[in-house]
Swiss-Prot record:
Classification of source organism: Eukaryota, Metazoa, Chordata, Craniata, Vertebrata
Source organism (scientific name): Bos taurus (Bovine)
Protein name: [F-actin]-monooxygenase MICAL1
Matches recorded under PROSITE patterns: BMERB, CH, LIM_DOMAIN_1, LIM_DOMAIN_2
Entries under InterPro entries matching the protein: bMERB_dom, CH_dom, CH_dom_sf, F-actin_Monoox_Mical, FAD-bd, FAD/NAD-bd_sf, Znf_LIM
PANTHER family, per the entry: [F-ACTIN]-MONOOXYGENASE MICAL1 (PTHR23167:SF35), CALPONIN HOMOLOGY DOMAIN-CONTAINING PROTEIN DDB_G0272472-RELATED (PTHR23167)
Coiled-coil blocks: 928-1030
Region of interest called Disordered, as start-end residue ranges on this chain: 643-690, 754-838, 865-887
Start-end of Pro residues biased regions: 671-684
Length: 1070
């Protein structure tokens, strides 16, 4: 039947319509189709029914079935839910078209205006599972056969617009091209309607079109008047996108895509890139669609060094303006990074062309995010109401093209259509606005993990998409200002001052309140009399009493008597840091001397904000640290625990550190950690001569103000100084080391080995030209771009002769790669010392599987699963496609993939193999997306902390220098300083929470990579392995054991923290 050549012209037009790849071709073929059928285009759902009835064509039936299935959902009321509602949609981007499709299915008349005349954006969008299912339900595979057929689920913006345009045309949406919306024309008198101001001169019918709903999807640069947009900025992030011609050769199709490589948890790739090409990146992604699409975040200094930017301007717009960007250098930069990431396997990279015929490569500002403060408004003039809604980038302009833009854009389109439905049902303006704003509050928090799992049930009704939905979260009284009944001046797009931090919780209202709280907490202790916030704390007893009140088990009150002032203060400072998460702001010496009263007030305010809700009865406090202190405390313990685990696994000397964090009260230590000698390059002699420890930075020697102080191991630093010398990442106490040779600080990953000079090439060349051809920059590093954990193998410690290298036999290796983790007793050799490594390996792989949540199944269960797969493989192609739509649980898909590899099922069922491979890639992408979101927030926190430090420095200088200022003014300044301290503590706590998540991601990624690498070695024939292969396999096994132990330590600490916080909740204690 498919081979029969049809002579019906409507059939030919329909085929052209399906295959059209240019906007004008789509429009002309659709006009031809309507002409051949005698149907007037743009007639709403009635046009769709006429086309469907008259086009009796076999190739159209599957498309009609999909659209009819969607339209048959009860929410649309058979296309009569919004009959009589007239809508104007501005913008034919993906979100505008998706909103138009929903409105058309509701039965509204929809007119769409677009200022462009063609689709030319090649950039590729990552898709969430629900967007894939949604687009397939609209016939995406019919319009674009390669939709989501690769290892990653994505689509180019141009292809997405084309398929949505085709659906919108079929559903009767009236579309006008080359028309720019410039504003609204209110009704001149009662009984008339709202119109649009359009340029250039629109058709007469469009100029007279009166509508009662406006949906703006015109992008972030245009927001209708009346809406206020807030700008959120973080640390400068320069994004570069590049599209290269995809020749679709066999060689190109075999190059694997890169779902995401982020410096935040995987740095070896970027160090290799820097050494090979001089390019310094934060992250890179590679998608293969109509083009080879690369997106990366580059560092400004690298762009300046390589001549991509002419000059360094403080203003971002001027920095990245066309006059300051060198196009040829930018092209070399993008080509070299792309060639390195793909190991030169794409051949000669030729840039695709943009809408202006130029090479499709650009640099732009990733720093700014725009977010509308409200998603909808109602305007009323002369008794005629107009409902305005925002979708797409003019509602929320996303930071990173990883699916959040199109996914949340589709959600916003659904929510806007639901709002129009409620409007058409006659709900009051304030009720409609309140519901819409309640949904808008959820939008920025949505992710595939916190929405309903069954994407097949998603529909227009918000309850099908959002769990725990509360449509009354915003009340009608809270949205009165969004109901405009009077003429107002246009509200221009504005950028508010950024406050990236969360609102400080528990801020101290005054010094009197802080003093009163301290007196309540220390009341009843012998010898403790708190009368002020300075001299009362000099003997150390008051601080010990405060710590004891919050942690009674650490010390008996009687033991406070007899302690010296310095001894007691040092003990209290250490206990507060290690057990309460309160980092020091001043040294024990300064506290005893009373030389820094401002620092003492700031330090005590941290106790107040963290524990102000704690009752002051002795022994009433649980082991949990509430508020901001908990995250900082947990991160410190985590860093020390992971480092101790690494040290024990590597057989290294732990430096005499005790395994427990507690310091015995009987022998309190007043010794400070070793301070670098004066002749070391980073420590000035003045530190040990004239100033106290907290007044000068231990690295740069410059003055430290209160809000700049960061304490680690008894020393104080600037935050900007306390960074890894190699990767410049912010360090945390317990997660760094100072090299005894050069005096620099290093994160644990980049700490040079003792006795070896640091390789200066790790930091990259000071000045290096970009390679002019792909042959010059092909790395000789890892074989695949995602094997980023490979590097210099750790050298076995020669002073640990008992840790010998154990070689496993071939049967043992096969058992390690098997899911049957219990060996056959008959095959198990007699126990002997060398077999302890085999046992550890079994435990490592078992823990590796359990770390993913994978159950150890019996052979009967595995056989049943294989039989079930055989039954599924006999289904039709359409059923197979729908099966792939259902998102697999990440743990189960890991289990299935390993099962398939070891049982040979993967080769027998290629569809299953492709599905599992794609799902594995999706899990990798989820980690990358999460890492990118964390990186973005960390940048925002860093920018906010710098701003707080600058404001705090001004206040502190004013307090210390203006001795003649009125006492009332000084008290006001102190209160402002305390508020800044609380905001800083809140931001630091959030930063600690993010760093904990980074540790999880890092270990999860390492375990996944090592597991895959170990299985690669085990699947080889033993007779084909070289000595180097066996040595590498043993090293990978040791690394896997190390990572498994670290993840185990992290899970134990997280469980301890959870139980501790649970015990501290009201109603749980006692």
């Amino acid at each position: 039947m498919a081979s029969t050549i049809s002579t019906n012209p409507a059939h030919a037009h329909f085929e052209s319509f399906l295959q059209a790849q240019l906007c004008q071709d789509v429009l002309s073929s659709f006009q031809g189709l309507c002409g051949a059928l005698g149907v007037e285009p743009g007639g709403g759902l009635s046009q769709y029914h006429k086309v469907k009835a008259q086009l009796n064509y076999w190739n159209a039936k599957s498309l009609w079935a999909k659209l009819d299935k969607r339209a048959s959902q009860p929410v649309y009321q058979q296309g009569r839910a919004c009959t009589g509602t007239k809508c104007l949609v501005v913008g034919a981007g993906p979100c505008g078209l998706r909103a138009a499709v929903e409105l058309a299915m509701l039965g509204a008349r929809v007119v769409l205006v677009e200022k462009r005349t063609k689709f030319s954006r090649h950039n590729v969008l990552h898709l969430w599972p629900f967007t894939i299912h949604d687009l397939r339900a609209l016939g995406a595979k019919k319009f674009y056969g390669r939709f989501c057929t690769g290892s990653l689920d994505h689509i180019s913006i141009r292809q997405l617009q084309l398929l949505l345009l085709k659906v919108a045309l079929l559903l009767g949406v009236e579309i006008h091209w080359g028309i720019t919306f410039t504003g609204l024309q209110p009704p001149p008198k009662k009984g008339s309607g709202w119109r649009a101001q359009l340029q250039p001169s629109p058709p007469a019918q469009l100029a007279k079109y009166e509508f009662d709903v406006l949906i703006s999807a015109a992008g972030g640069k245009f927001v209708p008047e009346g809406f206020t947009v807030r700008e959120m900025r973080g640390k400068l992030a320069i994004g570069i996108t590049a599209n290269f011609v995809n020749g679709r050769t066999v060689e190109e199709t075999q190059v694997p895509e890169i779902s995401g490589v982020a410096r935040i948890y995987n740095q070896s790739f970027f160090q290799s890139l820097l050494k090979a090409t001089g390019i310094d990146l934060e992250n890179i992604v590679y998608y293969k669609d109509d083009t080879h699409y690369f997106v990366m975040t580059a560092k400004k200094q690298c762009l300046l060094r390589l001549g991509v930017l002419h000059k360094d301007w403080p203003d971002t717009e001027r920095l990245l303006g066309s006059a300051n960007v060198v196009p040829e250098a930018l092209q070399r930069f993008a080509r070299a990074a792309a060639d390195f990431a793909t190991h030169g396997k794409l051949g000669k990279l030729e840039f695709a062309r943009d809408a202006h015929g130029r090479p499709d490569v650009s640099a732009f500002d990733f720093t700014s995010m725009m977010r509308a403060e409200s998603s909808a408004r109602v305007q009323e003039r002369h008794g005629t109401r107009l409902l305005l809604g925002l979708v797409g980038d003019c509602l929320v302009e996303p930071f990173w093209p990883l699916g959040t833009g199109v996914a949340r854009g589709f959600l916003a389109a659904f929510d806007a259509a639901w709002m129009v439905k409620r409007w058409a049902e006659g709900a009051g303006p304030l009720e409609v606005l309140a519901e819409r704003e309640s949904l808008y509050q959820l939008l920025s928090q949505t992710s595939p993990e916190n929405m309903h799992r069954n994407v097949a049930q998603y529909g227009l009704d918000p309850a099908t998409r959002y769990p725990n939905l509360n449509l009354r979260a915003v009340t009608p009284s809270q949205v009165r200002d969004l109901y405009d009944m009077e003429a107002k001046e246009p509200v221009q797009r504005m950028s508010d001052e950024t406050d990236s931090g969360k609102a400080a919780t528990g801020a101290v209202g005054s010094q009197e309140e802080l003093l009163r709280w301290c007196q309540e907490q220390t009341a009843g202790y012998p010898g403790v009399h708190v009368t002020d916030l300075s001299s009362s704390w000099a003997d150390g007893l008051a601080l010990c009493a405060l710590v004891h009140r919050l942690r009674p088990a650490l010390l008996e009150p009687s033991e406070l008597q007899g302690m010296g002032a310095l001894e007691a203060t040092s003990w209290a400072l250490k206990m507060a840091e290690h057990e309460l998460g309160i980092t020091p702001v001043l040294s024990a010496q300064a506290m005893v001397a009373g030389s820094d009263p401002l620092g003492l007030i700031a330090y005590l305010s941290h106790f107040h904000s963290a524990f102000k809700s704690v009752p002051h009865n002795p022994g009433s406090v649980s082991q949990g640290s509430p508020g901001t202190a908990s995250a900082v405390l947990f991160l410190g313990k985590l860093q020390r625990t992971l480092q101790r685990t690494r040290t024990q696994e590597n057989g290294e000397d732990a430096g005499g550190k005790k395994p427990r964090l507690e310091v015995k009260a009987e022998t309190p230590s007043t010794e400070e950690p070793p301070v670098p000698k004066p002749d070391e390059p980073m420590t000035p002699p003045s530190q040990q001569q004239d100033a106290s420890a907290e007044d000068l930075c231990a690295l740069c020697g410059q003055h430290l103000y209160i809000l700049e102080r960061l304490c680690a191991d008894g020393r104080f630093f600037h935050r900007s100084c306390f960074r890894c010398h190699i990767c410049e990442a912010t360090l945390w106490p317990g997660g760094y080391r100072q090299h005894p040779g050069d005096g620099y600080l290093y994160c644990l990953q980049h700490l040079p080995q003792t006795g070896h000079e640091e390789d200066s090439s790790d930091r990259g060349p000071e000045s290096q030209d970009l390679p002019m051809s792909s042959e010059n920059n092909t790395p000789s590093g890892p074989a695949t771009p995602v094997d980023l954990h490979q590097g210099t193998s750790p050298v076995p410690n020669p002073i640990q002769p008992t840790r010998r290298l154990i070689r496993l036999s071939s049967p043992e290796r096969q058992r390690l790669s098997s899911l049957h983790l219990t060996p056959d007793p008959e095959m198990e050799p007699p126990p002997k010392p060398p077999r302890s490594c085999s046992t550890l390996a079994h435990q490592a792989l078992e823990a590796s599987f359990k770390g993913w949540g994978m159950p150890v199944q019996s052979p009967q269960v595995l056989e049943a699963m294989e039989m079930g797969e055989e039954e599924r493989s006999s289904s039709s192609e359409e059923e197979t496609e729908e099966e792939e739509d259902v998102p697999l649980d990440s743990d189960m898909e890991h289990f299935l993939r390993n099962l398939a590899e070891n049982s040979g099922t993967m080769n027998n069922y290629p569809t299953w193999r492709r599905t599992l491979l794609r799902r594995a890639k999706e899990e990798e992408m989820k980690r990358f997306c999460k890492a990118q979101a964390i990186q973005r927030r960390l940048n925002e926190i860093e920018a906010a902390l710098r701003e707080l430090e600058a404001r705090g420095t001004e206040l502190e200088l004013a307090l210390r220098s203006q001795s003649s200022s009125p006492e009332k003014q000084k008290a006001l300044w102190v209160e402002q300083l305390l508020q800044l301290v609380q905001k800083k503590n809140s931001l630091v706590a959030e930063e600690a929470e993010l760093m904990i998540t980074v540790q999880e991601l890092n270990l999860e990624e390492k375990q996944w990579q090592l597991d895959q690498e170990l299985r690669t070695y085990m699947n080889r024939e033993e007779t084909l392995k070289t000595a180097a292969d066996r040595q590498a396999e043993d090293q990978v096994l040791r690394k896997l054991l190390d990572v498994v132990n670290q993840r185990d330590a992290l899970i134990r600490l997280q469980e301890e923290r959870r139980l501790s916080e649970l015990a501290s909740e009201p109603g749980v204690q006692g």
